[in-house]
Amino acid sequence: MNFEKIIEEKVNQKLKELRLKNSLEILEKLDINTELKEALKSTLLKRLNGEKEFYKISIDKKPKAVVAFSGGVDSSTSAIIAKQIFDVKAVSCYSKYIMTDEMRENAKNIAKKIGISLEFVSIDLEEVYKGVVNGKFHPCGRCHKVIENAVIDYAKKIDAEFVIFGDLLAFGYLALYREDEIFRFNLPSFFALTKDEEREILKNNGIELKMSYGCPLLKIYHKHNKGYKFTIQRILREVRGRVVNEEEGFKNIVEILNQQ
C-alpha cells in the first residue's frame, strides 16, 4: 500500500473542499441576481458532492458574459461551464507575437465545437515585445494585463455583466468579485479545478487538446535571454497550489529548458 499517495490524495481532497466552501462564502456576500446566485450555489454543492458533471444546470434568464478565450485547456473549460449559466460571447486577443495563424484556426475550431460565438480583438504588444527582446522583463505579467484590459473593454462595450477568465490560482475573494460595474469571474479557481479535471471535462465534451507550454512570445523571451527562472517559478507556483501535478510540472520545466 502506497501510504504517501493515499496521504497526498486526502490532502488534495481536503484542500479542494476548503476552496469550494470558501467560494460558497464569497458567493453569499455578493449582490447578484438571485437566480444566478442559486444556480452557482447549486453547481458548487454538486462539485462538493463529487459530481463529475456539476456544471450541467438550467437557468431561465442567463446574464451576459464575455469569456477570455485562447482555445487552450483553461479557457475552453471555462467556456464549456460558463455556457450552462451565462449568455456567452468568447473573445480572443490577437497579436502576431502571441498567436500564430494555426493557433487562431484552432481557437475557431474549439469555439465551434463548444457552440459559442468567437470574436478576435487585436491588441498592441509592440512595447512588450521590445522589452522582451532587450531583456528588460519577463513577458507574461505585462502581456496578461494588456489582454485583461482588452477583454474588459470589450465587455463594457457590449454591456456584459461578467468577464470570465481561466485562472486556476485566483483563490478566495479573487475568484469572483466586482470591479467597477463588471463582475470578474475566475471560473476554474472558483470551482477549485485542477488541470487534469479540466482535461476530463473537455474529453467528456468531445475535446482533446495537446499543446506545448507557453506562447510564441514566451519562447522568444527564452531564446533571447536564456533565462528560465521566472517561467519555472510560475510553473512551481501551480504545482504548490496543487492545480498541476508534480509530473506535469516537471514535464513543463524540461520542455522550456529545451526551447532554443
Curated annotation (Swiss-Prot):
Which residue spans traverse the membrane? none
Gene3D superfamilies the record matches: HUPs
Cysteines paired by S-S bonds: none
Which InterPro entries does the entry mention?
ATPase_PP-loop_MJ1638, DUF7411, Ni-pincer_cofactor_biosynth, Rossmann-like_a/b/a_fold
UniProt signal peptide:
none
Any one Pfam family here would be: DUF7411
Say which domain of life the source belongs to. Archaea
Q: Which PANTHER family match?
A: ATPASE, PP-LOOP SUPERFAMILY-RELATED, EXSB FAMILY PROTEIN
Q: What is this protein called?
A: Uncharacterized protein MJ1638
Q: Which organism is it from?
A: Methanocaldococcus jannaschii (strain ATCC 43067 / DSM 2661 / JAL-1 / JCM 10045 / NBRC 100440)
Q: What is the lineage of its organism?
A: Archaea, Methanobacteriati, Methanobacteriota, Methanomada group, Methanococci
